[in-house]
Structure formats: C-alpha cells, structure tokens
C-alpha cells in the first residue's frame, strides 16, 4: 500500500514496476533503429505514435500528423553524409509514469567503411496509447 502511494505521489514506480515499464517502453526505440538500419520506412512508421514530433539540430520542428506523412529519405542521408548505418549506443530512462517515459538516447552514425562520423545525444518521449508503446517525440542535435 505504501509503495502504491509513493508511485501515485511521485509518478515514479518502485520495485518491479520500473524495469518492466522500461523494457516495454524501450522496445519501440530498438525497433526504430532496426527499421532505420534496414531502410524500412513502413516498419519505422509502426514504431511511432501520431502526431509525431521531431526537433532537429537547428531547432526546426517537424510534426507528422499520421503515418502517411512520416518517413526518412535514406537516399538523401546517404548522399549528404555518406551514412551506411546507425548504432544505438545507450538508452537511459530518465522519467516515467504509466503512460509516458522520457529516455536519454545516444546514437552514432557510420560510413560504409565502418568509420563513425557522428554521435548524438537526444531525448525520446515514448507514450502508451491503448496498451501500445510508441515513440511520440524526439529531440536531437542530428540534422
């Protein structure tokens, strides 16, 4: 009973709630990077909740109202950066409650020869809608 009151008062789970929530909420982040590296926009779109918000390095805000607006132009990323793949370097849960989790995400980008050319810190907000976790918003210093 006391633990339940602590959760209600603080919004932070105690005991076994945090690890299970963390792994469930992290799953769409892992799936996003798998889809991104596979250059699979359909799979990538399924990891997101809509409207989806992305804030880029220049402070520009993209809002995708639904999956038809979402996606990544992989050809442009390859042309502009020489991108071949990305790695998910660390994912740290910073805040959470039953419907929203904030993650600090660090990822790197690599060229085809395996050279890492960029590492970015970012904030990802993952939400639970109708029992399904999805990435609702991302803010990073990546272009």
Where are these regions (language model features)?
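Short, cysteine-centered beta-strand-loop-beta hairpins and adjacent loop/turn segments enriched
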Residues: 109-117
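Hydrophobic/aromatic beta-strand elements that line small-molecule binding cavities or substrate pockets
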Residues: 88-94, 107-109, 121-127
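A short, structured loop/turn motif at beta-sheet edges
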Residues: 93-101, 126-133
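Generic short beta-strand segments
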Residues: 51-53, 104-110
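A solvent-exposed, acidic/Ser-Thr-rich amphipathic alpha-helical stretch
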Residues: 41-91
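Short beta-strand edge/turn micro-motifs at domain boundaries
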Residues: 117-143
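A short hydrophobic beta-strand element
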Residues: 85, 99-107
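Short, low-complexity N-terminal intrinsically disordered segments enriched in polar/charged residues
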Residues: 8-46, 50, 67-68
């Amino acid at each position: 009973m006391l633990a339940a009151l602590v959760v209600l008062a603080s919004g932070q789970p105690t005991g076994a709630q945090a690890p299970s929530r963390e792994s469930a909420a992290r799953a769409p982040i892992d799936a996003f990077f798998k889809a991104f590296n596979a250059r699979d926009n359909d799979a990538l779109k399924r990891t997101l909740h809509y409207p989806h918000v992305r804030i880029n390095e220049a402070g520009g805000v993209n809002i995708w109202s639904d999956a038809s607006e979402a996606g990544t132009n992989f050809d442009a990323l390859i042309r502009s950066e020489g991108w071949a793949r990305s790695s998910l370097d660390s994912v740290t849960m910073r805040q959470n409650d039953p419907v929203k989790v904030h993650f600090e995400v660090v990822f790197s980008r690599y060229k085809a020869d395996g050279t890492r050319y960029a590492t970015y810190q970012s904030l990802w907000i993952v939400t639970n809608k109708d029992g399904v976790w999805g990435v609702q918003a991302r803010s990073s210093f990546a272009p």
